Structure formats: C-alpha cells, structure tokens
Amino acid sequence: MNIMRTAMLLAFMTALFMGVGYLIGGSNGMVIALLMAGGLNFFSYWNSDKIVLNMYGARKVDQHSSPVYYKIVSDLAQRASLPQPKVYIIDSAQPNAFATGRNPQNAAVAASTGLLEQLSAEEVAGVMAHELAHIEHRDTLTMTLTATIAGAISMLGNFAFFMGGQRNSSEHSHGAGALGGLIALFVAPFAAMLVQMAISRTREYAADRRGAEICGNPLWLASALSKIAGGGHTVYNEEAEHNPATAHMFIINPLKGEGADSLFSTHPATANRIAALRRQAEEMKGAMPKSMGWSEEENFHKKNSNLDYDGLNRSAQTSIFGNQENNAVQRIKKRPSWLRYEDSKRSRS
C-alpha cells in the first residue's frame, strides 16, 4: 500500500512539474518539463548519495578514524541483515543525521558532530537504527527523488512568474500570463511541499518503529529525539537553510522557525513520535537491553552513557523539550479532528 501511495504521489509531482512547464511554454513546455523530470529522476537515482553528501560537506570515516561510531553502525547493520553502509560525519553543531543512497547496496549514513558529541552511545544507536530502517524500506531513494523534483518545481515556478509577466506586458494578454505565473510561483511549490509531507510523515513513523526493533530498545531512540528536539533548532544549519528541499531527509527537521512540529512540516510532531516509541517499549517490556557495551569503548562520550528512563517516561507531559515542544503539543490539540485522527492512526501503524 505504501509503495502504491508513494508511486501515486511521485506521479502527481511529475504532473505538477509538467503543469508548470505548460504555463511557461504551452504544450512544448509541458513535453520539455516531462523530459526534464525523467532526466532529473535518472540522475538522482544514480547520484543521490553523492549529491546530498557533497552538499553537506560530509567526510567518510572508518573503523580507525571513528571506531565506536563505525562499530555501532556495523553492529546494527548486521542485526538488520543489511550490507555495511558507508559511514560519514558532517561538521555541524546541530545534532542531526540522515541516510541516503539508491538501494541498500549503495547506501550511506551521516551523523553530525553535534549529534555524536551530545548523545550517548545507545542514543546514537537509536538514531542510526532509524536511518538503517529508512535504507531497509528503500525510503532513501524516494526521499531524494521528491527533494529533486520539489526543488525543480520551485525553480520553474520562479521562472514561470518571470516569463508570465514578460508575456503579459508584450502580448497585452489582460493579465492571463501574469496570473499563470503567480499560480506557478506560489501554488505549485506549495503543492509539492504537501506531497513531500505526505510521503515523509508516514515513513518517519515506520522508520521509528523498525529502528527500535533493530537496536532492541525503543527508549534509546525516544531519548535521542527528545535531546535533538530540545536543542537542535537553536543551532543554525546553513546548508539546510540554503537547501530546504532536503529537510525531510533528516531525522529531525533541521530548519529554524516552528521546526519539526509545524502543521506544514515534513516531520511528525516529536512528542507524537516519542509517545509511539513509549508504547512500543511497553509492548516489549523486559526484553529491552539497557546497554550494548558501546559506551565502554575508548574515545566515546562516557559522560552521556546513562539514560534517564524515568525522566523520559515523563517527557511527553513535562518541559523536557522546552517551550517549542510544549507549544507543539498545543498546536496538535487544536488541529481538526480528522487530522489528529490521521496522526494517531499513523503512529499505531
């Protein structure tokens, strides 16, 4: 069902791209846009990992340059029966991570220096297990394709607005060209953003659940999410701000503003994600390990090695996320009932 839904959403984005092409150049513009969409998808398929990793200046590490981080990823990949992905570090103070690649055999995971410095080994494992779940579900290809098309739609929207104004002034079309340009400039990128959200939100819940199964303890990921959400949006991520079409690839929305809990965000509310993970932990009960020994390795952040499980169990009701997260919970409660139902339905799936 998810595969069919994703295929339909990608088809809609391609049709939207063609519609913008039509506003620019009529039927010829529509055909050119279709060819461009095909070319972009083909290029993204073969180069998705290189595009994003180069964009964020990621540097590759191995068992010698970053032994504990690499071992965590390697151990989790074995537990998930996945090929060993390439492992990267991004020099950014904002705690965050993402996965990329066209398939499990050509995948890569990347974590920021901020994430590795602020999280315990078990919390890093929860985050990496989430990213490996995206690789296992082949979400990385879908997310890269949607980012590419959404970015192209925004670019064409700006071009269509400029061309529409030119046609209006030169052909005296009584505003038709300018109106079409306005539609392309504002409506098309907004619609593309909604499609990105529809793809990303559902997949984040699924990756959370599967990631918790891979690492063995849902509270590791829940604790990591609370720390990332609590401090991540106070740190400016210049690359993400310049490339907002890639925001949905991160475990937490890297953009400033209302962030990951906005109604128009690519990510579900962090409080909802943590609540779902807490329910999953209750289902697993005594079967969860509290440590896998990674914290005992040299050169990792031993000061963060103990998770506050009691504090985490109160996280959805207290101020652990700061004012931003509390406001997010209030916005969720004020949403229309049908939207709250959709969120709760996804968290249970």
From Swiss-Prot:
Record protein name field: Protease HtpX homolog
NCBIfam families membership: PRK01345.1 (NF002363), PRK03001.1 (NF002826)
Record family assignment: Belongs to the peptidase M48B family.
A biological process from GO: proteolysis
EC number: 3.4.24.-
Predominant location: membrane
Biased composition, class Polar residues, residue ranges: 320-329
Localization, UniProt: Cell inner membrane
Upper lineage: Bacteria, Pseudomonadati, Pseudomonadota, Alphaproteobacteria, Hyphomicrobiales
Sequence ranges of Basic and acidic residues compositional bias: 340-349
Cofactor binding description: Binds 1 zinc ion per subunit.
Domain of life: Bacteria
Record's keyword terms, sorted: Cell inner membrane, Cell membrane, Hydrolase, Membrane, Metal-binding, Metalloprotease, Protease, Transmembrane, Transmembrane helix, Zinc
Entry membrane topology: Multi-pass membrane protein
GO molecular function, one term: zinc ion binding
